[in-house]
């Protein structure tokens, strides 16, 4: 993995999970640098409080989530992380807006169990220009320099150990 990080900014993480119909912004680099090296955002709302297969550590959003958004922040109008972009299932089946994020409570639990601290969340909504500044400063492009065959090997290994990996992440 390779990243150029020029800022010490850390997103604050929300103390509460996303709310149904809450406005969200997904920040990331869909298609990597193929389109451009500039950050891209999509806006939408929380459309379900459960993820695929009734996974309650995730939520669903109608904000566009594409390859290259995974691992990126899903933030609210206060600039707080309310989730992390993880999956888009709709394109395979021709369904739109079937996008998922890991809830902030799951993120906090994982971080707390690994001794990672967070910034205290913002309490007021931010202007669009301020949100844009925070997103630009707080979201970085991370390149993966693995070959496709190595990635497939890692994915196959994860699939074999999915339950153990999942249980370790959820603790």
Where are these regions (language model features)?
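C-terminal subregion of chymotrypsin/trypsin-like serine protease catalytic domains
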Residues: 80-171
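Active-site region of chymotrypsin-like
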Residues: 1-10, 37-116
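A generic local secondary-structure boundary/capping motif
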Residues: 13-15, 71, 130
């Amino acid at each position: 993995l390779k990243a150029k990080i020029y800022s010490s900014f850390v997103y604050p993480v929300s103390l509460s999970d996303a709310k149904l119909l809450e406005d969200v912004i997904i920040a990331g680099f869909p298609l990597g640098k193929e389109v451009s090296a500039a950050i891209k955002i999509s806006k939408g709302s929380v459309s379900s409080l459960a993820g695929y297969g009734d996974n309650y550590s995730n939520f669903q959003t109608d904000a566009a989530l594409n390859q290259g958004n995974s691992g990126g922040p899903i933030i609210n109008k206060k600039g707080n992380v309310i989730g992390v972009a993880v999956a888009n299932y709709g394109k395979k089946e021709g369904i739109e807006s079937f996008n998922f994020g890991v809830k902030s409570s799951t993120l906090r639990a994982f971080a707390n169990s690994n001794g990672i601290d967070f910034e205290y969340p913002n309490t007021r909504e931010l202007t669009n220009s301020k949100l844009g500044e925070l997103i630009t400063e707080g979201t970085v492009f991370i390149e993966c320099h693995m070959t496709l065959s190595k990635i497939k090997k890692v994915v196959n290994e994860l699939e074999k150990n999915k339950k153990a990996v999942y249980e370790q992440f959820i603790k």
